[in-house]
């Protein structure tokens, strides 16, 4: 799931993804936006 959070590093996506999708969620930075996966 792509969320509306800008990023330049994958680590920047972990917190917003966990906040939205729970403790086991992960995140990647793709084209400057965070993509979360369960």
Swiss-Prot record:
It is found in: Secreted. Keywords: Disulfide bond, Ion channel impairing toxin, Neurotoxin, Potassium channel impairing toxin, Secreted, Toxin, Voltage-gated potassium channel impairing toxin. Disulfide bonds join 7-29, 13-34, 17-36. One of its GO terms (molecular function) is ion channel inhibitor activity. Coiled coil: none annotated. The record marks 28 as: Basic residue of the functional dyad. InterPro entries: Scorpion_toxin-like_sf, Scorpion_toxinS_K_inh. Pfam families: Toxin_2 (PF00451). The record marks 37 as: Aromatic residue of the functional dyad. It comes from the Eukaryota. Transmembrane segments: none annotated. The keyword Secreted applies. Expressed by the venom gland. One of its GO terms (cellular component) is extracellular region. The keyword Amino-acid biosynthesis does not apply. Inhibits human voltage-gated potassium (Kv) channels Kv1.2/KCNA2 and Kv1.3/KCNA3. Does not block human Kv1.1/KCNA1 at 100nM concentration. Has the structural arrangement of an alpha-helix connected to a beta-sheet by disulfide bonds (CSalpha/beta). This is Potassium channel toxin alpha-KTx 2.21. It comes from Centruroides bonito (Scorpion). The lineage of its organism: Eukaryota, Metazoa, Ecdysozoa, Arthropoda, Chelicerata.
């Amino acid at each position: 799931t792509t969320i509306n959070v800008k990023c330049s590093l994958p680590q920047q996506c972990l917190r917003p993804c966990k906040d939205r999708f729970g403790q086991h969620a992960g995140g990647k930075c793709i084209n400057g936006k965070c993509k979360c996966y369960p």
